[in-house]
Amino acid sequence: MGVALTRSAQWTAAGHGAKTLEVTPLNEAIVKEIIMFVESFIYKYPQEANYVFVEPLEWKTNLDPSAFGSGYAVSGTTVKSEEADKNGEPLLYLSVPQIKIRSFGQLSRMLYIAKNMKLKEAQACIEANRNPVAKILGLDYNIISEKIGNSFVSNILDKITKDDDSESEIKMKIALQLKQLDLHLLNHSLKHISLEIRLNPGTVKNDIELLKQFSGKGKQTVLESIEYTSDYEFSNGCRAPPWRQIKGEICYVLVKPHDAETLCVTCSKEGVFLNGGKTDDEGQINYERKGEIYKDLVTLLKEKSAIFSENMSKQEIKFSEQPQKDQPNEAPKEEVAITHKASVTSRKSTQEKNRINLGRSQLTKRLEPSLNWRTSVSSKDRNTLRDTQVEKHGGKLEKSRSSVSPGRAQLIRKSVEKIEEIISDSSSESEEDEEQPDHRQEANADLPSEYWQIQKLVKYLKGGNQTATVIALCSMKDFNLAQETCQLAIRDVGGLEVLINLLETDEVKCKIGSLKILKEISHNPQIRRNIVDLGGLPVMVNILDSPHKSLKCLAAETIANVAKFRRARRVVRRHGGITKLVALLDCGKHSGEPAQSSLYETRDVEVARCGALALWSCSKSYANKEAIRKAGGIPLLARLLKTSHENMLIPVVGTLQECASEENYRAAIKAERIIENLVKNLNSENEQLQEHCAMAIYQCAEDEETRDLVRLHGGLKPLASLLNNTDNKERLAAVTGAIWKCSISKENVTKFREYKAIETLVGLLTDQPEEVLVNVVGALGECCQEHENRVIIRRCGGIQPLVNLLVGINQALLVNVTKAVGACAVEPESMMIIDRLDGVRLLWSLLKNPHPDVKASAAWALCPCIQNAKDAGEMVRSFVGGLELVVNLLKSDNKEVLASVCAVITNIAKDQENLAVITDHGVVPLLSKLANTNNDKLRRHLAETISRCCMWGRNRVAFGEHKAVAPLVRYLKSNDTNVHRATAQALYQLSEDADNCVTMHENGAVKLLLDMVGSPDEELQEAAAGCISNIRRLALAIEKARYS
């Protein structure tokens, strides 16, 4: 057994904790075989089953002490077996959660008791006891250190010869049985492995490339995006590091489905599975497997994404109905790639012929690898173009065509850049590079004349003198460097290396010319990565110390372009770039240039603007935010915020907006009085500046003091007025977000009501993107806490669009809309509308949502719906399976879900018929299991639920039998008065049963309740007094019975 567990079983990599068994079919098969061996051991080898282990097998169990019956002594949270060794020590000892077992007989009985949990228990035992043979038989029988074969048997025979007694003979028999099990497990593993699916790099690559063709933002696409985590491809077709290729891993891909978070997937020879994703520190992949192994990528995605599965079936139908739609000789209608038409058409026809149904079995024909670099728009560019076409043509995907104009190439470049910025998330250092495949021009392509002209200029840069170099740089600058052909021409002939080398010369003119070109071409995502790979960023960081302001400006602007992805931002920080960029914000004090006032001031402003621009790009990672703060960036940004230069204000506010996501920054922003200037710039005519100011307020308004400052400085009125301009969706999302967060304060809600913002918000509930809807509904949810605002929303017809949004899939939107609907349901008139629109059923269906936040919010919303419905009992019973669903939610691990569900059950149980139904569904034992909690919110609602459930049948007695009374008494020691009131009411109801009274008295309830009789809360007084009265009556009755 030791060798099989060491060599065949698949263990997780040694991280911060102990190794665990991976969740693989092979491991499951091994564990099941071990279970079968142990379960049958007691019957096949009854004498050996009584053998006492040298050391107990010990692990953390999930078994409940109550599961043990005859043959065991159960006392509270401990269990002892009646069967003991010669010293009287029990062979099984459980002290929750630790369990110790010292014989095969007890192991076999434990598995019988575990029932459905036996697999988990066996796995936990194996993980906690990596060398079980040594513990069972002693170190002399340690199979792990022995070689399988005759040497093992001979060693055992030697031991028996030396120790000629019955115990040694039993040990020998057990050792041989374990050796046979070991060999059986090894053979079983080999058979299992031989049946597993084996993928190869070509299969995986073609599947990913074909999926890319059907990816994008359109409704008909199967995925939003799918990208490799690494551009580098080894000669064997793998992209995984060599030390992972040894384990059979081929590559790693980031997949973004339409209806789920981004998935980090490992493609290996054994199959495809989810890994641990990107780590927070260095952005490396956590290679540990998190889930099942699937035969291919399509199968995994069908399991994880309903939209993928649905759209894949549509693609199958589409291609089966129109097999002849795309012919190689079709005339190109739209420009997509910068390359020769004949070359691309030929390649495209090959792709069209090879395009097949991804949902079927593995591809039968694979693309042959090529040594030629090709120039083509990357898969990401194609996705971006497809998304643009979806927006223009109502969601219909247009086919890509063969060539592209310079303007079209620039559009693609900007779109790709925007996607990359979105992926480079602003909230955390764990954002990941969206690395793209490295595309180069094909040698024999018919390229524009500019391509060859630029390559000639690069040759002059390489071999010319200083004068020739400057002339070549000036000539190169005259080309349209925004055109991708020109950018790639510079790179393909080695021009990037030359330009970066020029930055290390002493000639200022050469540096300026080189930086001007690098600044233009670094808008291209591939060029950015090439610059980082060639070590260009450290050189630019050093230039920031130059006394020449023009050089500093160009270097900072180029850094701003390059630092759009995580690796580049990390390089800037590690080479001291953040400190130097912060210094640029204050560069005027250290200037040594001629004091020509207007020119001097203009140059200073430009240097500070470029520095702020670079900091804005760098501030998208947490570590850089901290570096900016420690370098003293906040006071300098605050000072620049007072300037009148709009081109300066945008990057300054943008940097503050990114940084304001961190609590330390929000405190510093308050201290520097930045809110006042943010509010002031809301009145600017520049829409981009308004957007960033609103977004910064949105980030900062989590703090109550900041919300008050926004109101005091007059920021609510411009925010309300900006709601009327709905053309700019990005700005509208920022403004509605700021209004949402500001609405958390009641004083601000009153102001918004004065400015008629609530009516405007109701009007935004339709025909808006989800980013706007989340904020609009969030703001209405806060406003709905007041009666006047609920009336306004109802009169403006806001109930119906709110209820309509309950059918969405966006988690944040569902959380907000359920809160808003629940708040509206407090009004009887609104509740009638919600009921008529089937809103309660929609809320109830959200209890099945996989996201705990959505479940909890939906449950809270149901409470006022049940309270204010005309015939609540009948309404609840009308939902088929609804009561059982609510009761089963009591098995959740999320405290908020549990508290909200308890609140729902409290309202459901007001109807006696419904109370009877949920009692039949087992609500009493489930509530009793939750009693041992320290969460005051859950305690309060749990106590209220128990109080209400006591009013049916023998539920009072059942709560006592399930040991719910003693934990409730401890609730009285809480500091929360609401918990005291609910607990006293529950104890009062429970005290109607004599056994419960005894339990309360034993746990010291009387003294605690006596203190609460003097509470100013009348309900608490009454419940406490009633409970004491019941306990006292029981005591008197016992006393009377004793003397009579």
UniProtKB/Swiss-Prot annotation:
Expressed in trachea multiciliated cells. Residues 317-338, 379-401 have a biased composition (Basic and acidic residues). SMART domains: ARM (SM00185). This is Outer dynein arm-docking complex subunit 2. The gene is ODAD2. GO terms for cellular component: outer dynein arm docking complex. Component of the outer dynein arm-docking complex (ODA-DC) that mediates outer dynein arms (ODA) binding onto the doublet microtubule. Involved in mediating assembly of both ODAs and their axonemal docking complex onto ciliary microtubules. Residues 317-409, 423-446 are annotated as: Disordered. PROSITE patterns: ARM_REPEAT. It comes from the Eukaryota. One of its GO terms (biological process) is outer dynein arm assembly. Keywords: Cell projection, Cytoplasm, Cytoskeleton, Repeat. HEAT repeats lie at residues 448-485, 487-527, 530-568, 627-665, 668-706, 831-870, 874-914, 916-955, 958-996, 999-1037. The keyword Translocase does not apply. ARM repeats lie at residues 484-523, 525-564, 535-577, 622-661, 663-702, 746-785, 828-867, 871-910, 912-951, 953-992, 1004-1031. The keyword rRNA-binding does not apply. It is found in: Cytoplasm, Cytoskeleton, Cilium axoneme; Cytoplasm, Cytoskeleton, Cilium basal body. It comes from Bos taurus. Component of the outer dynein arm-docking complex along with ODAD1, ODAD3, ODAD4 and CLXN. Interacts with CFAP61.
